[in-house]
Amino acid sequence: MRRISALLTAFLLTLTCLTAMAQTPAGKIDGTIKDENGQPIEAVTITLLQAKDSGRLKETVTSKTGHFTFDNLPTGKYFVTASSVGYSQLYSRVLELGTGRLAQTLPPLVMTGVTTSLHEVAVVGRRPPIEQKPDRTIINVDASPSNTGSTAMDVLEKAPGVTLDKDDNISLKGKQGVQVMIDGKPTYLSAAQLADYLRSLPASAIDQIELMTNPSAKYDAAGNSGIINIKTKKNKLKGFNGNVTLTHTQGVYPKPSGSLNLNYRTGQFNFFLNAGYSHWEGFQVLQINRKYLDADAAQTINSIFQQTTVMRFTNPEANVKFGMDYFLNQKTTLGFVVSGFRNKEQDRSGSNIQLMNPNYQIDSLVYSPNTNNTTWKNGSANLNFRHQYDSAGRELSADLDYVRYSSISDQYFNNLTYSPDNVLLDQSILTGTLPSTINIYTFKTDYTRPLAKGYKLETGIKLSYVNTNNTANYYDVVGTKSNVDTTKTNAFIYRENVNAAYVNMTKQYGKWTVQAGARLENTNYYGHQLGNGLTVINNDSSFSRSYTNLFPTLYLTYQASEKNQFTLNYGRRIDRPAYQDLNPFLFFLDEYTYQAGNPYLQPQYTQNVELSHTYNRSLTTTLNYSYTQNFFTQTFEQSGQATIVRNGNIGVRQNAGVSVSYMLPVAKWWTAVLYSDVNYTKFTGVLYGQDLDVQATTLLVNVNNQFNLAHGWTGELSGFYRTKGVEGQVVVYPLGQGTAAISKKIMKDKASLKLAVRDFLYTNKPHGYIDFQETDATFNNRHDSRQVAMTFTWNFGKPLKGMSGASKKNGGAGEEKSRVKAGGNAN
């Protein structure tokens, strides 16, 4: 409670010091963008400029009605520009805001379609599925019909530059260690928990996904490969409105889901409610073959292990989010958000294991029917504040957050050993109960201020505190009696505190824009293995560490011409071990495979450099290089016939690559988004006393074809292909997937039907091999990836008369606003 009180006090003090803010006259400029047929154009980039020197002030994008608004403008002369792929750039007349006329509405601005040199066809502008910005790539989830009935993990898997390994660990441009954020906030989940969460988060709840390979100092330094920010939907229209989405997905097993989004905004208040439910069923078939070798020069085979595990899971999940914004005036907003979800996963598996001699003759057979039932709950609360001093961009925001995760897993392992002629030789039953809780407290504040001579200052602080409690109670079952297994029963607590402060300075020199920043982070953590007091192995032990690091960033942008832009950026980042990865006790997957933590695991540090060129806002080419020290990844240690999987620091990772992203207007009705990257990765170090020196070059190709057909029909054909790659000890063979979808607007464009088929060739089957110590292993993994999904979406309600929600539309300069409405900024 003391920590909560301290954070709340800091939050209230921040608000109190702002109660005497001076009020200045605030003007407004708005307008509408239409095409040559008089139809509104969505997602057009609108830039507000000063008439005296053409200096850029703000940027936004048009709403679905083609509307845009710039609020809180001081008196002066302005004009706007409108730009969108497939249209000629448009300039408005000069508008003057002065005493007696603080609001100006432009007449409808008509954009003219341009003709490409490819086939001399016109291109229709619309919200693209993928947008390439100087500092990030944006995935517009609803723009792709193939996202129908999918999950956040499915969307990420086909995102440009994103790859998933055999355990669904996420890599960005060939590098692991990505920080995944939800609405600008870290999840604080382990890799396995994050994968489970993303598999349960429906794509229908997501608005955008931002991919940032080298974020500025404003963001957490965590994530050596960058940040993936998943922005959930937030209704922005005034009045009462909402939508209902119903989806049925069918693979081998059914996966129904539904969601409801409501929003009511009137006067000084905005209320919103999002709720959803999904019931996913699926399967996984995992085949593992291990050859145990003698430690002699010949590496002769000592024994052979072949395992086939069939898993069936059921995963019902319910989620809800409720929030309110109170607009004190045009400049100041207070808000709160509460949310939660409940997930109850039931996993049932059966493993058939053959233990053989070097001549492939069976020595024994093991059959293991296992169950693992996990109930996972989350609750969070946020208080947020935002104040815009003026239209020049001076702004202050503050957030106070509390997040709690709790879970309990009930495990049952039954191992039956048979002779080659199927005579039962032995049976062992192990049960486990593993409760866990995570509590997270954060406070942060951000301040932005334009300074004299064109400088812009950004600064802020963030304080976070995390505590976790984990217990593992294991029992050996003999007959009807359960006895405590003292070699496995354990308890572990972990505490972590990170204090951060950052500063960014931006300045434009003619065609050059320079941003230099630095983030200082102080980390303190403490882990305590409580033990069970019954064995020497699990006696009480603890560890702690404190360290402070500086993380500089630098961005140089050169606008060579209207169509050519060059960007060079540098950043230093950190990736801290997940608290579960520091937990030293074992977690059982089956009798021959364990997971364990490593209390000696150190953070890894990465230096990233990128050079990119963007042509005509459609073709972006990027060169990148990164160097990671203390690189940690999943390692495999052999203990008898059992394999122990744990994270370990293995040495140095170097990554060099080139990527190309191109939005190609093939025809008036056909736009292709092409992405490709080539990455060279090298690992050097020492692992379990053996030298490690592995390298690989991997090609990733991602193609997304969007078809804008007549009479409200749209279609998509997309896919990706990845050649062989390496991650530490693991080599993964080529992998790919194809997706097709079609969508139709109905009910006077208030509703839509979407049909999608994912992995229609059933090629998304991760497989590869692992060489470690005196063991060679291969693995093959297939799951319920081939699916057909049908979705119905109905949008209802309408804005109040004379009121527009465009001021809350998420645009280039509205990122902070969007994050505040989500309950906070990404920091």
Which residues does each predicted region cover?
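Outer-membrane beta-barrel translocator/receptor signature
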Residues: 221-228, 236-287, 315-318
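Short acidic/polar hinge/loop motifs at secondary-structure boundaries
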Residues: 97, 186-213
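Structural signature of Gram-negative outer-membrane beta-barrels, strongest in the C-terminal barrel
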Residues: 400-403, 436-442, 448-469, 483-629, ...
